[in-house]
Amino acid sequence: MNYVLAVKSPVYGKQGAFLAYQFAQALLEKGHVISQIFFFQDGVSNGNGLVYPANDEFNLTQAWQAFSAQHHIPLHLCVAASQRRGVVDALTAKDTDHTNLAEPFSRNRVVRRRVSMSAMATVLLRTK
């Protein structure tokens, strides 16, 4: 089955983004395909390259980066949500020497429609 994942939980403070990461791994282990992962609302913090967890904490941003590189799955951030939360790239930063969008995350207005329309399921993980 082909999936598009949508993550709205922050990189730290709640466990939703980590659960989404584990879910994405489990999908691939079961032979499913993930076309892309879209981060919106507080989930855009997963693409902040300036997040530095404590040495004894799991670095979720780095985990998403490695996951994307290993499986060739694009990671997209909502443009409006990332702008509001200060996650900027060279195109949107007032000072292009100071950006914090982590590679390979990219900013997109919406989940790419062609890909998401071809997906068999779009999954939005919600946690309280």
Q: Model regions: which residues?
A:
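Hydrophobic beta-strand scaffold residues
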Residues: 34-35, 75
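A glycine-rich helix N-cap at a beta->alpha junction
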Residues: 53-82
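Short, conserved beta-strand edge motifs with alternating hydrophobic and charged residues
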Residues: 5-6, 36-40
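N-terminal glycine-rich phosphate/adenylate-binding segment common to multiple enzyme folds
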Residues: 79-128
